[in-house]
Swiss-Prot record:
Organism: Caenorhabditis elegans
Stated name of the protein: 6-phosphogluconate dehydrogenase, decarboxylating
Enzyme class: oxidoreductase
Lineage: Eukaryota, Metazoa, Ecdysozoa, Nematoda, Chromadorea
Pfam family, one: 6PGD
PROSITE patterns: 6PGD
SUPFAM superfamilies per UniProt: 6-phosphogluconate dehydrogenase C-terminal domain-like, NAD(P)-binding Rossmann-fold domains
GO CC term (a single one): cytosol
């Protein structure tokens, strides 16, 4: 008998919590997992006493679904998703819906959307953010794919999503792989935010020489203002935490950061579309550098470092703490500006017609990068839907103008003390490049023409490309002989 509103495949913690969330909001969910024992265990424990039902096969699961059938997968990205889709499709009919709620690459979602459309099945790639707690009590959801599926999913998704000022942190993103693209950029920005906070922590520790309680107090104070965010909040909590010996735990953690690859995907997309998403790139590379722990230990003993006392660089600690907060805020503005540049380019490339204000709202609650700051981004795009860059919005122009001097002081101080701040400094370099009427790319073009005859465009004659015989002795090279 068809009784379930939706099926969820994958009973790891995220899948279980999303099912329980749906149940809390009055939806009947059919739970399925390849390992049938997990279904029985879930029904006997976490789901006991609820309306949640289970299935021991894909065929049974599909028979228990109301039409149009809605099947959501929360399984490992890549080949497992394709294999599961292949197993589900024979049991579906035209007009049924498959939702991929995993961390899939947007290119895979583009392909799956097209392939399933040819079979009459509607595909939705849905970014899900917020971790285990978000899945249970309200995630940020970013659905994209076949727009005809949205009316059949909207009620479920918007009810289970996090709320910000009463508005659900979920809306339709766009066609094909747009939902997973937006989630990918979200994850890239998350990498950037985490690296910026890590650099601020490093400066507070090494340049201002604060202890963990003092640093936690500073972050608690930051969390009352423009930097208010989930990541600042949890960082303060981390710094307050004490282990069994009553000591701060962070200094005891090996300083070698892992990554699952979604930050790299953002960088790959930025390179593919020719966009300078530099801060996220530096955040990824900072993790790569951190992984060279043994080499760094050897290098720290062999290679020279600045012999400068923090007291000679930071004369007023209270002032410098304020300057760090301003540098963090300015760098954060640049990071989000770069992220939305990438979203805008993908929207143009794929004709997705993304609503950037709505995306900012989706991120305001339930997800890892949720913050007060996103409300300002939402307002910027609501005010000017054609805004080409966040830096050009009046609010952010004013904010970065006020922060600029502090930003430069902090980066210079870090350089003098030998404290690595790749995210702060790359954000500042981007800002200086973006605000420069002339950059030395004219010399790059001359070099390319010299060794490769790639030609260059003249300022006085836009659209006119010329080649110079730089040596005057013949010996020209051709652009097809060397391409750079």
């Amino acid at each position: 008998m068809a009784e379930a509103d939706i099926a969820v495949i994958g009973l790891a913690v995220m899948g279980q919590n999303l099912i329980l969330n749906m149940n809390d909001h009055g939806f009947t969910v059919c739970a399925f997992n390849r390992t049938v024992k997990l279904v029985d265990d879930f029904l006997a424990n976490e789901a006991k006493g609820t309306k949640i039902i289970g299935a021991h096969s894909i065929e049974e699961m599909c028979k228990k679904l109301k039409r149009p059938r809605r099947v959501m997968m929360l399984i490992k990205a890549g080949t497992p998703v394709d294999m599961m889709i292949d197993a589900i499709v024979p049991h579906l009919e035209e007009g049924d819906i498959i939702i991929d709620g995993g961390n899939s690459e947007y290119t895979d979602s583009n392909r799956r959307s097209e392939q399933l459309a040819a079979k009459g099945i509607m595909f939705v790639g849905c970014g899900v953010s917020g971790g285990e707690e978000g899945a249970r009590f309200g995630p940020s959801l970013m659905p994209g794919g076949n727009p005809k599926a949205w009316p059949h999913l909207k009620d479920i998704f918007q009810k289970i999503a996090a709320k910000s000022n009463g508005e659900p942190c979920c809306d339709w993103v766009g066609n094909a792989g747009s939902g997973h693209f937006v989630k990918m950029v979200h994850n890239g920005i998350e990498y950037g935010d985490m690296q910026l906070i890590a650099e601020a922590y490093h400066l507070l520790s090494k340049a201002v020489e604060l202890n963990h309680d003092q640093m936690a107090e500073v972050l608690d104070d930051w969390n009352k203002g423009e930097l208010e965010s989930f990541l600042i909040e949890i960082t303060a909590n981390i710094l307050k935490y004490r282990d069994e010996q009553g000591e701060p735990i962070v200094p005891k953690i090996r300083d070698s950061a892992g990554q699952k690859g979604t930050g790299k995907w953002t960088c790959f997309a930025a390179l593919e579309y020719g966009l300078p998403v530099t801060l996220i790139g530096e955040a990824v590379f900072a993790r790569c550098l951190s992984a060279l722990k043994d080499e760094r230990v050897r290098a720290s003993k062999q290679l020279p470092r600045p012999q400068v006392s923090p007291d000679t660089v930071v004369q007023d600690k209270r002032v410098f703490i304020k300057q760090i907060s301003k540098a963090l805020y300015a760098s954060k503005i640049v990071s989000y500006a770069q992220g939305f540049m990438l979203l805008a380019e993908a929207s143009k490339q794929f004709n997705w017609n993304l609503n950037f204000g709505a995306i900012a709202l989706m991120w305001r609650g339930g997800c890892i990068i949720r913050s007060r700051f996103l409300g300002d981004i939402e307002h910027a795009f609501q005010k000017n839907k054609q805004l080409s860059n966040l830096l050009l919005d009046d609010f952010f122009t004013k904010a970065i103008t006020e922060a600029q001097d502090s930003w430069r002081v902090v980066v210079c101080a870090a350089v003098r003390l030998g404290i690595p701040v790749p995210a702060f400094s790359s954000a500042l370099a981007f800002y200086d490049g973006y605000t420069s009427e002339v950059v030395p790319a004219n010399l790059l073009q001359a070099q390319r023409d010299y060794f490769g005859a790639h030609t260059y465009e003249l300022l006085a004659k836009p659209g006119t490309w010329v080649h110079t015989n730089w040596t005057g002795t013949g010996g020209r090279v051709t652009s097809n002989a060397y391409n750079a």
